[in-house]
């Protein structure tokens, strides 16, 4: 099949028929900052399934999400993960000994703590008899941690799971070059002075050039920013639309922060520094200021900039998941049910960031729901262009038929229900921790707004995606 990003969209003018095909209603910032919808009474059926245990979220917390290179810069990942676990223990008062298993997601691993879930659990005082493992699935690593926990509970293997994620972008592993690594390993194996001198004679100063962590996709050699730029062009998403959406995200996040709606954030006393109490990447600006920024990836004509992209972030999250009967027996009032979920993958070169478009209809069909049934949408915002391209794909019968094998489009999420408390563009995106933030935002919004169903969705590196249905627990 001809790739969507090369034909028929290259050199596409904004006023083309394709742009009209994929047009969406204007994203007026002022219209999207109105008060949240009035609390509404829902009478929809529950998604409980016969003979399958109900899995509930008791509560979840996260450290403040901070710009990398700020207050967390001297920490290690397990420090942040431990802080999230400690915050969860304080928030829920759950006895450590009842936790059956701990699962954390992370992406860029610190080699000293490759199983960061285990190290953080021990540091937080959990029993050394409590197993813990770490998963990685790019930006949906915490989602994978949660759904692994759901599977363990639903199958009867466990009753109580702690799932979460962590990322510390302030201190990523920087390696010696491969030639230098090989030389040092060979020197370590050398048995005589002659062998060592022979190896040392092969040393060259360029061996000392460091090997930085890869920022591009291994399979395509393209950065995610480049892919986002090409995707925005393919779907005729303008620079102005992207900036408007980013401004919306920051403005809504600031409003939510000021009103105390980001209740999942727990204070963290950074050793040797002050206590951090809130996210520090929320920065409402103006369209005029944002328009001054130059393209970050495809220069000089790209539309993805630092202002309409998520930023490198440090942070951790943790969530207490239980079998419903266990939670009630312990006296908890859960916040939400974790219902159906779906993982998808598609061509990483052509459709790297379209995971939500593919995952959403599958999880809705699995749950027997439609877009109209969803009261709170929480999508991961990697880039404004990524979100808006997904919107246009989801709202296109043509895309559904030609690329998804569907007869009708998925449908466009109503903006008045979408990421109402900000998103990754403004709150930050610690790769391994974002999934838990999304689920807790959906659960807390459902309680606040009186809705019943939330839809969480995210894209991920490698052309993968995830979607999950969250159902409010009856009050």
From Swiss-Prot:
Keyword annotations: Acetylation, Acyltransferase, Endoplasmic reticulum, Fatty acid metabolism, Lipid metabolism, Membrane, Mitochondrion, Mitochondrion inner membrane, Mitochondrion outer membrane, Transferase, Transit peptide
Main location: mitochondrion
Record function comment: Mitochondrial trifunctional enzyme catalyzes the last three of the four reactions of the mitochondrial beta-oxidation pathway. The mitochondrial beta-oxidation pathway is the major energy-producing process in tissues and is performed through four consecutive reactions breaking down fatty acids into acetyl-CoA. Among the enzymes involved in this pathway, the trifunctional enzyme exhibits specificity for long-chain fatty acids.
Superkingdom: Eukaryota
Modified residues (N6-acetyllysine): 73, 189, 294, 299, 333, 349, 362
Similarity remark: Belongs to the thiolase-like superfamily. Thiolase family.
Membrane-embedded but not crossing: residue ranges: 174-221
Transit peptide feature range: 1-34
GO biological process, one term: fatty acid beta-oxidation
Entry GO CC: endoplasmic reticulum; mitochondrial fatty acid beta-oxidation multienzyme complex; mitochondrial inner membrane; mitochondrial nucleoid; mitochondrial outer membrane; nucleoplasm
Catalytic reaction list: an acyl-CoA + acetyl-CoA = a 3-oxoacyl-CoA + CoA; butanoyl-CoA + acetyl-CoA = 3-oxohexanoyl-CoA + CoA; hexanoyl-CoA + acetyl-CoA = 3-oxooctanoyl-CoA + CoA; octanoyl-CoA + acetyl-CoA = 3-oxodecanoyl-CoA + CoA
Compartment annotation: Mitochondrion; Mitochondrion inner membrane; Mitochondrion outer membrane; Endoplasmic reticulum
Protein name: Trifunctional enzyme subunit beta, mitochondrial
Residues forming the catalytic site: 139 (acyl-thioester intermediate), 459 (proton donor/acceptor)
Pathway field: Lipid metabolism; fatty acid beta-oxidation
Residues modified as N6-succinyllysine: 73, 189, 191, 273, 292, 294, 333
Pfam families: Thiolase_C, Thiolase_N
Site residues, Increases nucleophilicity of active site Cys: 429
EC number: 2.3.1.155, 2.3.1.16
Self-association state and partner proteins as the record states: Heterotetramer of 2 alpha/HADHA and 2 beta/HADHB subunits; forms the mitochondrial trifunctional enzyme. Also purified as higher order heterooligomers including a 4 alpha/HADHA and 4 beta/HADHB heterooligomer which physiological significance remains unclear. The mitochondrial trifunctional enzyme interacts with MTLN. Interacts with RSAD2/viperin.
Molecular function GO labels: acetyl-CoA C-acetyltransferase activity; acetyl-CoA C-myristoyltransferase activity
Organism: Pan troglodytes (Chimpanzee)
SS bond list: none
């Amino acid at each position: 099949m001809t790739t969507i990003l090369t034909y028929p969209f290259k050199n596409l003018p904004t006023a083309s028929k394709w742009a009209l095909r994929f047009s969406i209603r204007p994203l007026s910032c002022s219209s999207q900052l109105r008060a949240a919808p009035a609390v509404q009474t829902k009478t929809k059926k529950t998604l409980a399934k016969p003979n399958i245990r109900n899995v509930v979220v008791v509560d979840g917390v996260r450290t403040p999400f901070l710009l990398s290179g700020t207050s967390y810069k001297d920490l290690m990942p397990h420090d942040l993960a431990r802080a999230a676990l400690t915050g969860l223990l304080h928030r829920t008062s759950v006895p450590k000994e009842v936790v059956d298993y701990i699962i954390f997601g992370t992406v860029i691993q610190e080699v000293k703590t490759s199983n960061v879930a285990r190290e953080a659990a021990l540091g937080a005082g959990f029993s050394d008899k409590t197993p813990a493992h770490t998963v990685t699935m790019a930006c949906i690593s915490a989602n994978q941690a949660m759904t692994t926990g759901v599977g363990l509970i639903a199958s009867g293997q466990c009753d109580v799971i702690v799932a979460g994620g962590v990322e510390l972008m302030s201190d990523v592993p920087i390696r010696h070059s491969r030639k230098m690594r090989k030389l040092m390993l060979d020197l370590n194996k050398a048995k005589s002075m002659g062998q060592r001198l022979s190896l040392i004679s092969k040393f060259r100063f360029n061996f000392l050039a460091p090997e930085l962590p890869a920022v591009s996709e291994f399979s395509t050699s393209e950065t995610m920013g480049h892919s986002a730029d090409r995707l925005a062009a393919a779907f005729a998403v303008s620079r102005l639309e992207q900036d408007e959406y980013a401004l919306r995200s920051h403005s809504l996040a600031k409003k939510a922060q000021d009103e105390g709606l980001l209740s999942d954030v727990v204070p963290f006393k950074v050793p040797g520094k002050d206590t951090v109490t809130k996210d520090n990447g929320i920065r409402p600006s103006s369209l005029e200021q944002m328009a001054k920024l130059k393209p970050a990836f495809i220069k000089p004509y790209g539309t993805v900039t630092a202002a309409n992209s998520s930023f490198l972030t440090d942070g951790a999250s943790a969530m207490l998941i239980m079998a419903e009967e266990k939670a009630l027996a312990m006296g908890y009032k859960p916040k939400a049910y974790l219902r159906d979920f779906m993982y998808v993958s598609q061509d990483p070169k052509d459709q790297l960031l379209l995971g939500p478009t593919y995952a959403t209809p599958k999880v809705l069909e699995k749950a027997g729901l439609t877009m109209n049934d969803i009261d709170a949408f929480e999508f991961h915002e990697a880039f404004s262009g990524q979100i808006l391209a997904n919107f246009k794909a989801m709202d296109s019968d043509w895309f559904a038929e030609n690329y998804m094998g569907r007869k009708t489009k998925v449908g466009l999420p109503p903006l008045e229900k979408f990421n109402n408390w900000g998103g990754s563009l403004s709150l930050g995106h610690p790769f391994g921790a974002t999934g838990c933030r999304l689920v807790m935002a959906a659960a807390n919004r459902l309680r606040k707004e009186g809705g019943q169903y939330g839809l969480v969705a995210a894209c991920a590196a490698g052309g993968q995606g995830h979607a999950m249905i969250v159902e409010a627990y009856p009050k």
